[in-house]
Amino acid sequence: MIALIQRVSDARVTVAGENIGQIGPGLLVLLGVEKEDDEAKCKRLAQRVLAYRIFADGDDKMNLNVQQAGGKILVISQFTLAAQTNKGNRPGFSKGAEPIEAKRLYKLFNKNCSEMGIKVETGEFAADMQVSSTNDGPVTFWLQI
């Protein structure tokens, strides 16, 4: 399971011109689900994303996690994170989870985060979405479980 996380000043997602999720300061989480992923990996990744200290403290050091910084998260399903890109000119997607399982684990990831006390906004699974964000820093990390 893969999370590409970006520290943002703001982020939003629209589907068919309608705003369906929006946050101020916090994390934009692009979530990719792979075939071997399961509930345990999902929970561990949620814990790791929320605990990852990439927000500045009073000394301007990355010592605060998103909750300590008072932020929210916007989670977007992103199957292309599981792409195989090591050869050729076209990505392969055979490592990605089947859509039904990917959707289940995407929803579980969001539920796990909510249960850990963070405000979660989401995109729409498998929809054609437009995601806008202001990357703060820029600060972007790839987390994989």
Curated annotation (Swiss-Prot):
Extent of motif Gly-cisPro motif, important for rejection of L-amino acids: 137-138
UniProt EC number: 3.1.1.96
Main localisation: cytoplasm
Catalyzed chemical reaction(s): glycyl-tRNA(Ala) + H2O = tRNA(Ala) + glycine + H(+); a D-aminoacyl-tRNA + H2O = a tRNA + a D-alpha-amino acid + H(+)
Source taxon at top rank: Bacteria
Localization: Cytoplasm
EC class: hydrolase
GO CC entries: cytoplasm
Keywords: Cytoplasm, Hydrolase, RNA-binding, tRNA-binding
InterPro entries noted in UniProt: Daa-tRNA_deacyls_DTD (IPR003732), DTD-like_sf (IPR023509)
GO biological process: D-amino acid catabolic process
Pfam families: Tyr_Deacylase
Any one GO molecular-function label of the UniProt entry: tRNA binding
NCBIfam families: D-aminoacyl-tRNA deacylase (TIGR00256)
Stated role: An aminoacyl-tRNA editing enzyme that deacylates mischarged D-aminoacyl-tRNAs. Also deacylates mischarged glycyl-tRNA(Ala), protecting cells against glycine mischarging by AlaRS. Acts via tRNA-based rather than protein-based catalysis; rejects L-amino acids rather than detecting D-amino acids in the active site. By recycling D-aminoacyl-tRNA to D-amino acids and free tRNA molecules, this enzyme counteracts the toxicity associated with the formation of D-aminoacyl-tRNA entities in vivo and helps enforce protein L-homochirality.
Subunit structure: Homodimer.
Family of this protein: Belongs to the DTD family.
Comment, domains: A Gly-cisPro motif from one monomer fits into the active site of the other monomer to allow specific chiral rejection of L-amino acids.
Protein name according to UniProt: D-aminoacyl-tRNA deacylase
Organism: Psychromonas ingrahamii (strain DSM 17664 / CCUG 51855 / 37)
Gene designation: dtd
